[in-house]
Structures are given as C-alpha cells and as structure tokens.
C-alpha cells in the first residue's frame, strides 16, 4: 500500500482502529483534529534520527530511518490492539469500561470530568468523600470481584450523584482529598491553563496586522535552555525561499524569472 494516497486521518486514525474503537459504542466514529498523526510521526522520527546519529558517532555507520503513520498509530494504540486481539469487544460505552472508578462523569453544568480512583483500596474513602458511604459496604460492591462485576450499576449510581453539582464543585472536593481526577478541558481552554503557561508549553504570537494567536512548543525541554527565552518565529509565506534555493541548485536568475512568468513556481 506504499503508493496509496493518504493523510493522518486515513493511515493513522482509520487504518489503525483508533477512529472506530475510541469513540463510544453506538455513536459515530471518532472525529479527530488534523495533525495528531503527523505530530506523532515527527516525535518518533526525531528520536530515530537522534539514535542513528549516536550510532554513527560510536560506529561510523549510518542508518536509514523510516517511520510511518500506521506504525506510529499501532504503537500508540497497542493496548487497544491487544484488547481486540484477545477478544475484548470494542468499541464500548461508559457502562462497559474497566470499572466505575475509572470513567467519565457529567456535572450539573453539563461539563465532564474523568474520575481515576483506580486503586480499590481507596474506594471506601472515595464513597465517604462524595456522600455515599453506604455504597462501600453494599454487597454489590464491597469486594473486588463484585465491584468489577456490577460496574454498570455502580456507574449509574455515580451518574446520579455527580449530576447534583457542577464539575467545579467535584473538582475542589476531590482535590482536597487527593483523589485522582481531571476536568475534561476544551481546546480553547488550553492556552490559559496555569500549568501550560508556567511551563511555556505554548507561545503567544502577534502578526504584523495585529492578529493574535498561539503556537505549541515542542514536547521536550532541555535543562540548558530556558523555554521562556526561546523566540517564536514563523516560517514566512509559501514560496519565500524558492528563488534562493533554486540559485543554490545552480539556476540562473533569468531561468528563475522565466519559471515565475510561466507560473511553474510562486
């Protein structure tokens, strides 16, 4: 299939199972945003290049580094691939997740958060904190086996409880007791996230016409470089360096001018 046309939507998301099996059962397939597959490949390729340069430094031998969208997707989604290979029915809905302590829940404000009380030993404490102490001793949930077996029923109970207050209320309560969770943020919220700002994960940028935007920083920080001091520069308009590159390749200015006139380049 090396000659087939494709994008990260097709080769990364559709071909790998991510698009079909990450979305809830009974609904439409996952609708990804562009570039996730491309960025995943870029990170993998950077690591491969670094490793091959290290090998060349040590042995004098080079490497041809190859990374594909499908290969990166099967690596990222390997847990799902193994689940499917071993007979796990996918996609699944919220009531068929691993257990009720690791699931998404909706507050009264319509927003969602992810509950990650994965350790069953904290289940009684969690029930006490959210105001359902009787659940911890309920025969349907008071053993590990029963807890997993009756996960759908318990999820419905939690659904009703968490619908009593907005997500911010539950966030503060769970945070106070150091119970793992996270609010489901929206993309629009990310640039204002205090953690993102403190670590310079994104850069604000203003174009010459006054338009403001943000750019994502790379996912790796080096101790010798202060991310706050890294300048954010844009690449410029398409074709900005075309003439320079052609000159470096040996074309004359007259030949380049003819290419522009014939609309062979821009």
Q: Where does each model-flagged region fall?
A:
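Conserved PLP cofactor-binding pocket of PLP-dependent enzymes
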Residues: 175-199
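Short acidic-hydrophobic surface loop/beta-edge motif
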Residues: 103-108, 202-208
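Residue-level signal for nonpolar/aromatic packing positions in well-ordered secondary structure
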Residues: 49, 60, 126, 174, ...
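Active-site-adjacent "lid/gating" segments in soluble enzymes
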Residues: 1-117, 125
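Aromatic-enriched alpha-helical interface/lid elements that frame and gate functional surfaces
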Residues: 101-177, 181
């Amino acid at each position: 299939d090396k000659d087939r046309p494709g994008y990260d939507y097709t080769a990364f998301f559709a071909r790998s199972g991510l698009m079909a099996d990450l979305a809830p059962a009974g609904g439409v397939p996952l609708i990804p945003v562009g570039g996730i597959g491309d960025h995943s490949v870029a990170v993998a390729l950077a690591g491969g290049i670094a490793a091959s340069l290290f090998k060349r430094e040590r042995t004098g031998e080079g490497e041809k580094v190859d990374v594909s969208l499908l290969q990166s997707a099967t690596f990222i989604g390997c847990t799902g691939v193994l689940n499917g290979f071993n007979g796990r029915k996918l996609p699944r809905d919220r009531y068929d997740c691993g257990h009720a302590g690791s699931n998404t829940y909706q507050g009264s404000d319509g927003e969602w958060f992810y509950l990650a009380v994965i350790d069953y030993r904290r289940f009684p404490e969690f029930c006490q904190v959210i105001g359902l102490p009787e659940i911890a001793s309920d025969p349907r949930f008071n053993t590990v086996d029963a807890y997993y077996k009756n996960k759908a029923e318990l999820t419905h109970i939690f659904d009703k409880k968490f619908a009593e207050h907005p997500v911010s209320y539950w966030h503060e309560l769970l945070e106070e007791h150091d119970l793992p969770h996270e609010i489901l943020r929206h993309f629009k919220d990310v640039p204002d996230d205090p953690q993102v700002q403190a670590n310079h994960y994104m850069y604000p940028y203003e174009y010459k016409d006054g338009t403001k935007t943000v750019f994502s920083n790379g996912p790796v920080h080096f101790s010798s470089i202060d991310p706050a001091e890294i300048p954010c520069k844009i690449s410029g308009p398409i074709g900005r360096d075309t003439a320079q590159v052609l000159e470096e390749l040996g074309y004359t200015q007259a030949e380049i001018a003819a290419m522009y006139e014939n609309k062979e380049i821009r």
